Regions:
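PLP-dependent enzyme catalytic core of the Aspartate aminotransferase-like
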Residues: 70, 149, 296-297, 306-335
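N-terminal "arm"/small-domain region of PLP-dependent enzymes with the aminotransferase-like
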Residues: 1-56, 63-66
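Short, conserved charged micro-motifs
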Residues: 40, 286-292, 322-325
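PLP-dependent aminotransferase class I/II
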Residues: 55, 188-265, 269-272
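Conserved PLP-binding catalytic core of the aspartate aminotransferase-like
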Residues: 266-297
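Phosphate-binding glycine-rich loop
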Residues: 57-101, 119
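Active-site phosphate-binding strand-loop segment of PLP-dependent enzymes
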Residues: 117-119, 124-175
């Protein structure tokens, strides 16, 4: 019997495609990467390509473990965080580890639902019925940060109902890392991290996660062999030594976010409170039409229609000069 196949999730970060399409230098506000990343002194070593990576990634896991005070048996790595979302869902939903129902906040990152559905799980509107509760923290696209106290309360609820709290902290280093639960070991908790956003390297696909050893062993078994390529591993080893420098990034982002929010409000648009390097904006008109107008002005923003928000856009915080260009283009489109 034919079964409806899930629809591919939509993402921002289409600047390269737009530049190739229009032959113009488009300013990409759709990709929410760090506009003030640490200076990582790294260059690709071509000799690394002569060997297979260590598929256990022992050195890499030891480096991660030393930062987050976790044993390497509690750490998994993957070709970007999305690979780990996919593998996690495959492991827990298809192997009887959890009930094949999931709960997620709305709006939120589309890959959770897609990955869960690909593993034959179905959504529920009742958190206590879920085998997995997906928490994006800070949330994408709203920028809302769930405080640690509330996250731990959610964890207690999932433990009580014999479920798993999946906490995606891809953006938390650009928000408030003191609210992270990455250092907490609990059989009912899986925490996801990524270098993409914090270090502004979407071309380096590297994600990592934390969970109980039994779950991590299954994820590492289900993951494709050598899925973290030699360049990604090499870059990650260097970048992880620069985590403390992200404090400067957070300060600069906060300053620019406040300026950008005020400038957006001055245009008569509603910007939602955000804790991170992007802002959700209610534009009071069809988002797709506004995005097309902005493209004609060489500005790319994230159309939030795919989030179920057809009159909203998501805007990344960039440098002050770039943010001024955005506001000027936005002003021309809404007035």
């Amino acid at each position: 019997m034919a079964v409806d196949f899930p629809v591919k999730a939509i993402h921002g970060g289409t600047g390269k495609r737009q530049r190739e399409k229009t032959r113009k230098n488009v300013l990409d506000f759709s990709a929410s990467t760090n506009p003030f990343p640490p200076k990582v002194n790294w260059e690709p070593d071509l000799h690394l390509l002569e060997y297979y990576p260590d598929d256990y990634y022992t050195e890499l896991k030891e480096r991660i473990g030393s930062i987050f005070h976790r044993d390497i048996t509690e750490i998994c790595v993957g070709n970007g965080s999305i690979e780990l979302i996919r593998v996690f869902c495959s492991v827990v939903f298809r192997n009887g580890i959890s009930r094949n129902r999931f709960y997620l906040q709305s709006p939120t990152f589309g890959e959770y639902e897609l990955s869960a559905r690909l593993s034959a799980a179905t959504p529920t509107i009742v958190p206590s019925d879920a085998g997995v509760y997906f928490l994006c923290n800070p949330n994408n696209p709203t920028g809302l940060l769930t405080k640690k106290e509330k996250t731990l309360a959610l964890l207690d609820e999932m433990k009580y109902h014999k479920g798993i709290l999946f906490c995606d902290e891809a953006f938390i280093e650009l928000s408030d890392p003191s609210q992270s639960v990455a250092e907490i070991s609990d059989p009912s908790l899986f925490v996801l991290r990524s270098l993409t956003k914090s270090f502004a390297v979407p071309g380096i696909r590297f994600g990592y996660g934390f969970g109980e050893p039994a779950l991590i062993e299954k994820i590492e078994t289900a993951r494709s062999p050598w899925s973290v390529n030699a360049f990604a591993e090499s870059y990650a080893l260097e970048a992880l030594g620069h985590m403390e420098e992200l404090e400067g990034s957070r300060s600069a982002i906060e300053r620019e976010r406040h300026w950008l929010s005020s400038a957006i409000s001055a245009l008569g648009l509603r910007s939602y409170p955000s804790s991170v390097n992007y802002i959700l904006v209610e534009c009071g008109q069809d988002a797709s039409s506004l995005c097309n107008e902005l493209i004609r002005k060489d500005i790319l923003v994230r159309d939030c229609t795919s989030f179920g928000l057809p009159t909203s856009i998501r805007i990344a915080v960039r440098t002050h000069e770039e943010n001024i260009q955005l506001i000027e283009a936005l002003a021309a489109c809404v007035h």
